[in-house]
From Swiss-Prot:
UniProt keyword terms in alphabetical order: Hydrolase, Metal-binding, Multifunctional enzyme, Nucleotide-binding, Periplasm, Signal
Matches recorded under NCBIfam families: CycNucDiestase, PRK09420.1
Annotated signal peptide: 1-24
Superkingdom to which the source organism belongs: Bacteria
Protein name: 2',3'-cyclic-nucleotide 2'-phosphodiesterase/3'-nucleotidase
């Protein structure tokens, strides 16, 4: 009597096994990523008015095409910072988008079959209305889970998407793979674009948002979850609202891949080899495939999956990631041709941009190069500070609360080698006629001018924070020592404050880290700080012209909401252009000479010091250094990235 049930049970098991085996399949899936394109659609440097092989989506597109041809199944995503960042973006923002007009970035990207895009922090630079008009031109959807609409309390954008994606397995059979995409942006956008966003949106923590939504995506049937955070990679201990949250995302259960960006760096690469859990050879972070493909289209992110469903559901069995460059820095050769179709699509807007940046604004008496802007007072920063001070002094006339306060200005070198990843990224403005192209070269970002009210003590601490740019020099060592703290400090945080005089003693330890957090309360690098020839009064009150990013950040002493004196509606770049025009009308030309209000302090040592500084490798830079360097400098060759290395003598 037990024979029949046993036979039926065995038969059922065999049928189930046969069905499972018949349905079992292995699928290869490639996920491609672009990020931080910053409107660099063309392979063209509008600041120099010359073609380039080193960036531009028209070249990345060729890598995209090749990567797709190599794969049976592929999808393409973009990670934002798209509509701002090059003269093409400036051109479109200046003229505005008419109803139904498509932004050039989407004219190009709509031809490449993107599956989805994420919102970057720079998408908010021109306000929510302009962003909405721009996004309307995209033929692909957008996701972002942590930007919250104040009115509704819900995400402003679609938080995630699950896309039914047809794929072929290794036997050529068709399947449906449900790919989930979720996007995130840095919470700091509420500081950086405070004027555009306050009262309209809030931004939640990236990691906590992921923990909320990823289980929901799995519940809704996502076979694969691809996170697209506009956020960088840091292994610092977790902090709520961290700007760079990718490491913590890699520890969130349910995420299968991280396509990240924001930091303008390349992962996997040796730059991240020391991070615990980072497998540079495999391209994984805590076992999760992750990729960050640089900036401006100079790399394409590639994640390759092998998925298998022999257990009845799709599971990742293998995964690896890489970032493919469009240019070989070692051989100085292009690795990607121009995409002819994109060149055609962009032709009219490209010419419009060239015409836009060629508008004359004035005349300069001398060249303005930023080759030495990190180590001495410099004309490219000086002219910005001059413009900001002139604007502020004019603005406060007649104001009973502000008119009698002394005016200072803070500005930083925006183009001084990038993040030590671009030996060509320096300001190069020639004397003679100046155009808007030159103003954009001198002031890279569409920031607005904001004036803060700060004490003399704040000025000192502000400068101490800026001085974290330098490594501490050991005066008892004769070994080569690198002067610039490239790893932990961004040059756009190296504020020069004009209107005061001071020296920076790099033999002393830094008081603050690269994020302006106090690390040594006994350290002092700023020496001989004076105002009008006298030691600065810590109790005195000053107005400091700066930009919205710095003013609202609260990181530097003297910044934050409580210090705001007034917020101008004008962009710093427009202020600079107007200053150049006014000076030209008044004097026939603008004179961009550094006033040398700061310098590196002379170092005392019993032996010769070998201090190294990196800058442009061009012959133009070498000649400029020969003529303008305030310290003796000796060329020592080039480093592996291509920067010229100089030995700088701070003992004289």
């Amino acid at each position: 009597m037990f024979k029949r049930p046993l036979t039926l049970s065995l038969l059922a098991s065999l049928i189930a096994l046969t069905t499972s085996t018949a349905q079992a399949a292995t699928v290869d899936l490639r996920v491609l990523e672009t990020t931080d394109l910053h409107s660099n659609m063309m392979d063209f440097d509008y600041y120099k008015d010359k073609p380039t092989e080193k960036f531009g989506l028209v070249r990345t597109a060729s890598l995209i095409e090749a990567a797709r041809q190599q794969a049976t199944n592929s999808v393409l995503v973009d990670n934002g910072d798209l509509i701002q960042g090059s003269p093409l973006g400036d051109y479109m923002a200046a003229k505005g988008l008419k109803a139904g007009e498509i932004h050039p970035v989407y004219k190009a990207m709509n031809t490449l079959d993107y599956a989805v895009g994420n919102i970057g922090n720079h998408e908010f630079n021109y306000g929510l209305d302009y962003l909405k008009k721009s996004l309307a031109g995209a033929k692909f959807p957008y996701v972002n889970a942590n930007v919250i609409d104040v009115k509704t309390g819900k995400p402003l954008f679609q938080p995630y998407l699950i896309v039914d994606t047809p794929v072929k397995d290794r036997d050529g059979k068709n399947h449906n793979l449900r790919i989930g995409y979720i996007g995130f942006g840095p919470p700091q956008v509420m500081i950086w674009d405070k004027a555009n966003l306050t009262g309209k949106v809030t931004v939640d923590d990236i990691t906590e948002t992921a923990k909320k939504w990823v289980p929901e995506m799995r519940k809704q049937g996502a076979n694969l979850v691809v996170a697209i955070p506009h956020s960088g990679l840091s292994s610092d201990p977790y902090k709520t609202m961290a700007e760079n949250s990718v490491y913590y995302l890699s520890q969130v259960p349910g995420i299968d891949a991280i396509m990240f960006g924001h930091a303008h760096a390349v992962f996997p690469s040796k730059d991240f080899a020391t991070i615990k859990g980072a497998d540079i050879a495999q391209g994984t972070l805590n076992g999760i495939p992750a990729v960050m493909p640089g900036q401006w289209g100079d790399h394409l992110g590639v994640v390759d999956f092998v998925l298998n469903n022999d257990q009845g559901q799709w599971q990742v069995t293998q995964a690896k990631a890489e970032a493919r460059p469009i240019f070989d820095k070692a051989t100085q050769k292009s690795l990607a041709a121009e995409n002819a179709n994109l060149m055609k699509v962009l032709a009219a807007d490209h010419q419009g941009t060239r015409d836009f940046v060629s508008q004359p604004i004035g005349t300069a008496s001398d060249n303005m190069y930023s080759y030495l802007s990190l180590i001495q007072d410099d004309p490219t920063v000086q002219i910005v500070n001059n413009a900001q001070r002139a604007y502020t002094e004019h603005f406060i006339q007649g104001d009973p609360d502000l008119a009698d306060l002394p005016v200072l200005s803070a500005a930083a070198p925006f183009k001084a080698g990038g993040r030590k990843n671009d030996p060509a990224s320096f300001v190069e403005v020639e004397k003679g006629e100046l155009t808007f192209r030159n103003a954009a070269d001198l002031y890279l970002y569409p920031n607005t001018l904001v004036v803060v009210k700060a004490s003399g003590a704040d000025v000192k601490q502000w400068l101490e924070c800026s001085a974290a740019q330098f490594n501490q020099i050991d005066v008892n060592s004769s070994k080569p020592q690198s002067l610039i703290n490239w790893d932990s400090f961004r040059t756009y945080n190296f504020d020069v404050i004009d209107g005061v005089n001071y020296e920076i003693d790099v033999s002393q330890p830094a008081r603050y880290d690269g994020e302006c957090a106090l690390i040594n309360d006994k350290a002092e690098r700023i020496k001989n700080l004076t105002f009008n020839g006298k030691p600065i009064d810590p109790q005195a009150t000053f107005l400091i012209g700066t930009n919205n990013y710095r003013a609202y950040s609260g990181k530097f002493a003297g910044t934050g909401d409580s210090h705001i004196a007034f917020a101008s509606p004008d962009e710093n770049r427009a202020v600079l252009s107007a200053y150049i025009s006014a000076e030209t009308k008044k004097h026939g030309q603008v004179t961009p000479q550094a006033d040398n209000n700061w310098r590196l302090a002379t170092l005392n040592s019993q032996q010769p010091l070998d201090i190294r500084f990196e800058t442009s490798p061009s012959t133009k830079a070498a000649e400029f250094i020969k003529q303008k360097a305030q310290y003796p400098m000796k060329a020592m060759g080039t480093d592996e990235i291509g920067f010229a290395v100089f030995k700088i003598d701070l003992q004289k």
